[in-house]
Amino acid sequence: MIQQQTYLNVADNSGARKLMCLRVLGTGNCTYGGIGDKIIAVVKDAIPNMPVKKSDVVTAVIVRTRQTVRRDSGMSIRFDDNAAVIINNDGNPKGTRVFGPVARELRDKNYTKIVSLAPEVL
């Protein structure tokens, strides 16, 4: 569950290292976001001389959460960290690589480019 003020790791090579969630998009009154939800975030830590700078406001997709996700098959999955991938207005990732595993729920939400860049899909 990701809510306002939650810090997330960045799982791509866009130049950002840490994000802070400002708003979860598309959830109505619910203030929590899960895997596959879009968020508005601010970059809190960034690598120098990269396209994404510190204090930039970006759109990202949540790819991993520490909160357990229950699937329809009865299986549950949980990751070691909260992580997101920075995307542009078209929904494509800004980086060219995705680090670490991502959840299968991203494929259902039509983030196939992120799934194809990921080294492992759980």
Curated annotation (Swiss-Prot):
Listed GO CC annotations: cytosolic large ribosomal subunit
GO terms (BP aspect): translation
SMART domains registered for this protein in UniProt: Ribosomal_L14 (SM01374)
InterPro entries per record: Ribosomal_uL14 (IPR000218), Ribosomal_uL14_bac-type (IPR005745), Ribosomal_uL14_CS (IPR019972), Ribosomal_uL14_sf (IPR036853)
GO molecular function: large ribosomal subunit rRNA binding; structural constituent of ribosome
Database matches in Gene3D superfamilies: Ribosomal protein L14
Keyword Phosphoprotein: no
Alphabetical keyword list: Ribonucleoprotein, Ribosomal protein, RNA-binding, rRNA-binding
SUPFAM superfamilies given in the database record: Ribosomal protein L14
Described purpose of this protein according to its UniProt entry: Binds to 23S rRNA. Forms part of two intersubunit bridges in the 70S ribosome.
Similarity comment: family membership: Belongs to the universal ribosomal protein uL14 family.
Subunit field text: Part of the 50S ribosomal subunit. Forms a cluster with proteins L3 and L19. In the 70S ribosome, L14 and L19 interact and together make contacts with the 16S rRNA in bridges B5 and B8.
Protein name: Large ribosomal subunit protein uL14
Source organism of the structure: Microcystis aeruginosa (strain NIES-843 / IAM M-2473)
